[in-house]
């Protein structure tokens, strides 16, 4: 990593970072992709995602899977961690949380392709697993997004009890 790539990163390396308990997309930070000529996936698994049910105010837990093909920018992982943590006291439905996360990451990075899959633990005997994806309009990634959306759960996993 070149020193100038770190100029806009304010959270990485800080020993004392305030944890925000309300949704705050402003905490997300990006840095330059040093390999924009390559197509490659970056994947994050966040097994401790928590938000609140907007009706009951009860906590909802999920593993969030974020995969993307970067273009010019990548998301900085500590800022992503703090961003996901900011949902802790945010009241919203599972489907909206996943769509908001996806749209915030698209706004930040303008990736070639991005998908966000939330696997929420069951409440009332039902688990909800919303899936969001995006492909850069007018590119092969737009068709890729459509194909993956239509086929993303073609062979569903065996649901254990998470």
From Swiss-Prot:
It comes from the Bacteria. Gene3D superfamilies: 3.30.1130.10. One of its GO terms (biological process) is queuosine biosynthetic process. InterPro entries: GTP-CH-I_C/QueF, NADPH_dep_7-cyano-7-deazaG_red, QueF, QueF_type1. Substrate binds at residues 75-77, 94-95. Keywords: Cytoplasm, NADP, Oxidoreductase, Queuosine biosynthesis. Pfam families: QueF. Pathway: tRNA modification; tRNA-queuosine biosynthesis. It catalyses: 7-aminomethyl-7-carbaguanine + 2 NADP(+) = 7-cyano-7-deazaguanine + 2 NADPH + 3 H(+). The keyword NADP applies. Its EC number is 1.7.1.13. GO terms for molecular function: preQ1 synthase activity. It is an enzyme of class 1 (oxidoreductase). It is found in: Cytoplasm. The active site is at residues 53, 60. One of its GO terms (cellular component) is cytoplasm. NCBIfam families: QueF-II. Catalyzes the NADPH-dependent reduction of 7-cyano-7-deazaguanine (preQ0) to 7-aminomethyl-7-deazaguanine (preQ1). HAMAP family: QueF_type1 (MF_00818). Belongs to the GTP cyclohydrolase I family. QueF type 1 subfamily. This is NADPH-dependent 7-cyano-7-deazaguanine reductase. It comes from Exiguobacterium sibiricum (strain DSM 17290 / CCUG 55495 / CIP 109462 / JCM 13490 / 255-15). The lineage of its organism: Bacteria, Bacillati, Bacillota, Bacilli, Bacillales.
